[in-house]
């Protein structure tokens, strides 16, 4: 995974590992088939020069389970065995109601589709608010991947 420091080329940032200006450049580098969607995040293997994953849920689990030797806090477990069923349940409604919910609103093709999507989104946000009014984190009293998955959408929601 290369960092993308700010670069002058058309207000794009440039990957310092391969000089890629666009995410598409990385997909082209690995010979992605025509019609592939160029999505992020990307977990990149520098040794093999390939995309390991572009699925955020898998990347979170991989980083949690496979990279402890590089972690500042290697004992942090975002998916502890005792909370897995709760985390999975929370992840399910957070994804459908919030993470994907904002896209359902943004890509609605009719007013009724938008109304349905925004209602579902705000029901899920109300649920988060109710949970966080009684406990510190969404899947219990410890920080888990459910919090990691929720955070970016909450942060981005206020800036759009």
PLM segments and residue spans:
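GST-like domain detector, emphasizing the conserved glutathione-binding G-site
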Residues: 1-138, 142
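GST superfamily/GST-like fold recognition
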Residues: 138-160
């Amino acid at each position: 995974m290369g960092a993308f420091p700010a670069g002058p080329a058309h207000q794009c940032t440039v990957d310092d590992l391969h000089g890629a200006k666009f995410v598409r450049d990385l997909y082209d580098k690995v010979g992605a088939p025509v019609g592939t969607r160029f999505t992020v995040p990307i977990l990149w293997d520098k040794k093999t020069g390939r995309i390991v994953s572009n699925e955020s849920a898998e990347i979170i689990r991989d980083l949690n389970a496979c990279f402890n030797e590089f972690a500042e806090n290697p004992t942090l477990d975002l998916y502890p065995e005792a909370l897995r069923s709760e985390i999975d349940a929370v992840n399910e409604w957070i994804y459908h109601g919030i993470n994907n919910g904002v896209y359902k609103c943004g890509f609605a093709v009719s007013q009724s589709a938008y109304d349905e999507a925004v209602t579902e989104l705000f029901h899920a946000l109300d649920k988060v608010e109710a949970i966080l009014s009684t406990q510190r984190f969404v899947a219990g009293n410890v920080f888990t991947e459910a919090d990691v998955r929720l955070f970016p959408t909450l942060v981005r929601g206020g800036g759009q």
